[in-house]
Regions:
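N-terminal-proximal low-complexity accessory segments that begin disordered
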Residues: 1-67
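P-loop NTPase motor core of the ASCE superfamily
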Residues: 97-98, 466, 537-583, 730-852, ...
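An aromatic-glycine-centered, glycine-rich loop/turn in mixed alpha/beta architecture
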Residues: 1-6, 20, 37-45, 53-55, ...
């Protein structure tokens, strides 16, 4: 195949067809589950981008194949695999589990032809193209590009980028990425190459032609319509056969030939480019755009309007009159003229949308093409496969090429607002660039890995703290245990409180890597959690006051609160114990000179808690516990606790039993100790996990403790992880606003509105419908730290022991995972979901033999975990 370019320099392409193109990578907008207001805001930005495009441009989106080694490399990023053997083994096992699976993610690009090239004489462009063909036929390298032309083109591209970047985030691509785009176009459906650093040119770029850079990449035989002996060859040969190396693949190209005459945005028949993911197969798409200036477009429309008006008179003799289509055409032109007149800066866009799919099997390729047609036909979109124009469409999807003549037969005449309603560059990625493999996104048609880095939030100006809410048995605790295991394996530290009688986190601790420590909170425990001995500085006063105030039930503004504060400050000045505060209150209350009734009352109440069995944890004489393990579990199996309704109701709270009051105060004290442990070493990431967080958040002291932890976590390399059954358990104030990652699992119908508000998409019909239909166990709506939302299936831990320990579902036989709706041996497929209005999805073909790609990570893992 003829190389599409004669020279490359950074993100600049000197086209073999003449002209110079610039190519940028585009950061897409969030789209799924967004509210109408958010979508209209994105539409306005896309419209501004399209208005600013030069005469020739291309909007391109490709489905990049993700290799297992690439996922493992992202998992290992920032982790010393030699020191953390458990994570090295997890990476290796992940590669094994993903081998043979087809994983994809979208990349979006914008290519524009630099305007100056179009002003050159057409004969000069034609002569250059002919000369390049002769040079290529003789096997010679094409002529180089002089430095002056390169510098001039770069300045032009930079000026264009400055203007376009006001509407969308752009990043210039590298020469290696351009080479990869050209190479993958001829290898899709087979041994599709993955993008990595190996695509960088093998020698320093001297801008002396791209023959040596591109010729090997496009070294393939492309046959329009294939050959007679192609298996399952259809009657209408609307495909191309590509023979590259030792394999043969098939590709077909479809174009959008008809569109609805009218549609509304959003959710009114538009957004056709985002709906391509509903088919369930990897689809590349591009929109070839020619921008016509406003004045020129208006002149053309006036001529067309006169011609159509003249046709009306031709039907004067007809009894039925002019056909309705003629009146519709006149109305459409009137509307177009009115819009162009009202917006003099708005051009007319002549757009051709091309879709591309590929497969090893020709019969499967035909099924996929039929699925695309079946999805769009009911909505008045005409999808066509030009016979004899497949090769031209293939070349038209390569950046830096001119639009093929066949594209003109399927041109749609649109305004920028109309094309923006198609939602190009919408559908952002989900998750973090690196971290643990959390699961797979299941609302994008093709399985997409979702990574979660517990430490990523501060790098983008957000907190690392997160929260998960879900009904009983929805999978939120399973997710937290998965997060614990991976965080510890990556070198972090986690502290949690286990209130269950069966000790679910105690059992889980035995499966975690590193060293674990279980601290049982009971009357016979020999540990001491005295805040005056466990804390230092002002923190020991704050925590002591909070703990004793919860026990005494006094307010900081009352006389008792003032007396308690005086006693704590007096005792904290010396190396004292918590019991000394009660003794000081007794002394103040029984003073012969100035007895303090408030102090006497406080001393009597607190003395009772000192004598209670669990009270020895705070008032006892044991040694302070050493909290330096990788995973610390405070186990309180028999701690008496009031329910949430009692805690938030003032009347019921006054009727709490002493054991319940003490239990609630001890939970606060343990949470404070956990926070101190997590924030003690800024060089090591730590997290304090509070499952069933309503117990802690029901009191103002607990809320303040958690809020301070979320605020300070970014500075101390720590995080607070919260989980509860109802979104309202977390409140609706600044605590929720400051959270980073948020997850919503299955919810009851009454909790749907609070759940969407918790996710920040209140009013989103899509999110409401997803939650209303119900989520299977282990599936959740995830909002990442960059405010992108998606539907994710959480996968189980890679360790068999951790998988069984994390699952608390009562069963007579061990279960494989809590995500019962998902086969853990493979990523979720498009057939696992049935979105409203989606077309049938063809059964995916089993993957063919895959070539194992050796990477630097593979060599490291071989050294750390043995041969794979």
């Amino acid at each position: 195949m003829k190389p599409p370019a004669r020279a490359l320099a950074g993100n600049l392409i000197w086209s073999a067809d003449g002209g110079v193109w610039a190519l940028w990578r585009v950061r897409p907008f969030a789209h799924a589950y967004c509210t109408t207001t958010e979508r209209l805001a994105v539409h306005a930005r896309l419209r501004g981008l399209l208005i600013g495009l030069p005469e020739q441009s291309m909007l391109l989106s490709v489905c990049e194949r993700v290799e297992p080694w690439d996922v493992a490399a992202d998992m290992a990023d920032g982790v010393d695999l030699g020191e953390h053997q458990a994570w090295a083994e997890a990476c290796r096992m992940t590669v094994t589990a993903l081998t043979g699976q087809d994983l994809y993610r979208r990349r979006h690009y914008l290519a524009v032809e630099l305007p100056g090239e179009r002003r050159r004489a057409p004969w000069r462009r034609a002569l250059r193209t002919a000369a390049l063909d002769v040079v290529s036929t003789l096997g010679l390298a094409p002529a180089g590009v002089d430095q002056a032309e390169i510098a001039s083109s770069r300045r032009q591209a930079q000026r264009l980028q400055v203007g376009l970047a006001q509407h969308i985030a752009l990043e210039p691509v590298t020469t290696g990425e351009i080479r990869w785009l050209y190479a993958r176009a001829l290898r899709r459906g087979g041994q599709e190459p993955a993008f990595d650093q190996s695509w960088k040119p093998p020698r320093p770029a001297r801008h002396d032609g791209a023959g040596g850079l591109l010729a090997p990449l496009v070294d393939a035989v492309v046959k329009e319509g294939g050959y007679r002996d192609d298996p399952d060859r259809p009657r209408h040969r609307r495909y191309v056969r590509i023979d590259s190396g030792r394999e043969s693949t098939y590709a077909t190209y479809l174009v959008v030939g008809d569109m609805p005459h009218q549609f509304t945005f959003p959710d009114g028949g538009g957004e056709w480019l985002t709906h391509l993911d509903d088919v369930g197969v990897p689809i590349d798409w591009c929109v070839r755009v020619r921008s016509i200036p406003n004045s020129e477009a208006q002149a053309k429309l006036r001529r067309q309007h006169r011609q159509l008006i003249g046709q009306v008179d031709e039907y004067d003799g007809e009894v039925s009159g002019a056909p309705p289509s003629l009146a519709e055409a006149i109305t459409a032109i009137d509307d177009q003229r009115a819009n162009l007149t009202a917006n003099p800066a708005e051009p007319e866009l002549q757009a051709t949308t091309i879709l591309s799919i590929a497969d090893r099997d020709l019969d499967a390729l035909e099924d996929r093409a039929e699925a695309i047609t079946a999805l769009f036909e009911p909505h008045d979109y005409g999808i066509f496969r030009p016979t004899g124009g497949q090769l031209a469409l293939l070349r038209s999807m390569l950046p830096g090429t001119t639009t093929a003549p066949v594209c003109r037969d399927y041109t749609q005449f649109l305004l920028p607002g109309d094309l923006a309603a198609g939602a190009p560059y919408c559908g952002a990625d989900l998750g973090d660039p690196c971290g643990l493999l959390l699961g797979f996104r299941v609302d994008t048609g093709t399985p997409t890995p979702v990574l979660l880095d517990p430490t990523y939030g501060p790098s983008v100006g957000r907190t690392a703290s997160l929260a998960a809410v879900g009904a009983l048995g929805s999978g939120k605790s399973y997710f937290l245990k998965r997060l614990c295991w991976d965080t510890i394996a990556r070198g972090g530290q986690v502290v949690t409180i286990d209130r269950t009688a069966i000790g679910e986190y105690v059992t889980f601790a035995d499966t975690t890597p590193g060293r674990c420590q279980v601290i049982r909170l009971s009357a016979d425990s020999d540990v001491c959690l005295d805040p005056l001995r466990c804390f230092a500085g002002d923190e020991r006063i704050t925590v002591t006051l909070g703990f004793l105030s919860l026990l005494a039930g006094c307010s900081g503004r009352s006389e008792e609160g003032a007396a308690l504060a005086e006693a704590v400050h007096h005792i904290a000045a010396d190396s004292a114990r918590l019991g000394d505060v009660i003794d000081h209150l007794h002394h103040a209350g029984d003073s012969t000179t100035r007895p303090d009734p408030a102090a006497r009352s406080l001393a009597r109440r607190l003395d009772h808690y000192r004598r209670l069995g669990p009270g020895r944890l705070a008032f006892g004489d044991g040694d302070p516990v050493q909290l330096d393990a990788d995973f610390l579990v405070f186990w309180a199996p028999h701690l008496a606790l009031a329910d949430r309704d009692t805690l938030i109701n003032e009347h019921l709270a006054r009727q709490m039993l002493p054991e319940e009051i003490l239990g609630h105060a001890l939970i606060y004290l343990v949470a404070a100790v956990s926070r101190r442990v997590v924030f003690s070493n800024p060089t090591r990431f730590g997290a304090a996990l509070y499952d069933e967080a309503w117990v802690l958040l029901a009191s103002p002291y607990g809320q303040r403790l958690v809020l301070e932890g979320i605020r300070d976590g970014r500075k101390h390399n720590g995080a607070i992880w919260l989980a509860s059954q109802h979104p309202n358990d977390l409140g609706a104030g600044e605590l929720v606003d400051l959270l980073g990652t948020r997850l919503v699992f299955r919810q009851s119908h009454g909790a749907i509105d609070p759940a969407t508000e918790f996710l920040g998409v209140a009013g989103s019909d899509d999110a409401t419908e997803i939650l209303r239909r119900g989520l299977p166990t282990g599936r959740c709506l995830l909002r990442d730290v960059r405010d992108r939302l998606g539907l994710v299936d959480i996968i189980p831990p890679i360790s068999d022991a951790a998988r069984q320990a994390a699952d608390t579902t009562p069963t007579q036989q061990p279960t494989r995972s809590v995500t019962a709706q998902v086969d853990t041996s493979r990523p979720p497929q498009a057939s696992d979901r049935t979105p409203p209005g989606s077309a049938r999805t063809p059964t995916p073909q089993p993957p063919g033999p895959r070539r194992r790609r050796r990477t630097p990570l593979a060599n490291v893992l071989d050294d750390t975990t043995g041969p794979t």
